[in-house]
Amino acid sequence: MTERKIIHIDMDAFFAAVEQRDNPELRGKPVAVGFDGPRGVVSTASYEARKYGVHSAQSIAQAKQRCPNLIIVPCRHDYYAKISHQIHQIFQEYTDLIEPISIDEAFLDVTQNKKGIELAVDIAKEIKTRIKEATGLTASAGISYCKFLAKVASDYRKPDGICTIHPDKALDFIAQLPVEDFWGVGKKTLQKMHFMGIFNGADLRKVSEEHLLEVFGKAGHIFYDFARGIDERPVITYRERKSVGCEQTFLEDIYLKTAVIIELYRTVLELLERIAKSGFEGRTLTLKVKFADFTQITRSISQEKVLKKKDEILPLAKRLLQQVDYSSIHPIRLIGLSVSNATSEEARMVDKENSIQKPEYKELELEFEDWET
């Protein structure tokens, strides 16, 4: 059997790099892309900012504490998406087996490539050069025989790096790999692993599959395989959409019923717009509420008919909100709504239609915390 050749391309600090490219005054300075308000969150931080401990998903307030001279630049998502599409077209020069997993990264299966290039590392070098010439941006590339190791490799020599993990070196590489660098290991999983005495791939390899399944559920089987360099997942050219949603963080915490209802209504309208744009139809509505102390809850309700109209979604959203306890001492910071639970046929049709126009970017759902309950 021919060994697969998988490349993972990951743009370096993509949003921040675009802003530094377009504005020479930002080059070499700590930059964060995000909303510069009391509730703002960092979307991407430049490498200069990361040296201070600034990172994505961090509050702007905390980021400024760590880096007082941090420059905040508003996010231009539509603009970044156009550049991402330009990069995707470069990928298509080499293979049609492309799996975008977010706006700034993708897997490519180049086992059989359009240019007949034998070595995957040569393809990766060409792609990096083409991206630099076309956009002025740098990318890091990871190469291996499976997706797990290709992604790990792309992080290994960032920024503007390239790393290959060969099959005969994989087990030794994994043995030394900290478990926090394993795909799918989040904070809760990491805490459990450390409690079990698992700190790297070698430690993980010593644990039986039965015990991993007992502790981590379905994810245990994946961790068992990853520790042995096994990952047979194919590069998927389109990803079945599982949900459509939106959320908003408020400038100030809210607790008055009228204010909460108004914000819920606005969120419903935003959700309806996204449903209309995506063409997705689901049967389950989920409400997400995050409180001022950053604790959060979700409530869901399902029905037989698909949800796509305001008079269908708004009453259900209000019913879900009634299940949430909030008050002046437990105010709300964020409200989110999503629709899920489509038939596979509907979801597949939506993705096929979308893929004709442009690649569908969706974060890989490889954080297994939901399986830990």
Predicted features, each with a name:
Residues 1-215, 220-221, 345-347, 354-373:
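Gly/Gly-Pro- and Ser/Thr-rich, intrinsically disordered tail segments characteristic of DNA damage-repair
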Residues 8, 181, 189-334, 339-372:
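DNA-contacting surface of Y-family translesion DNA polymerases
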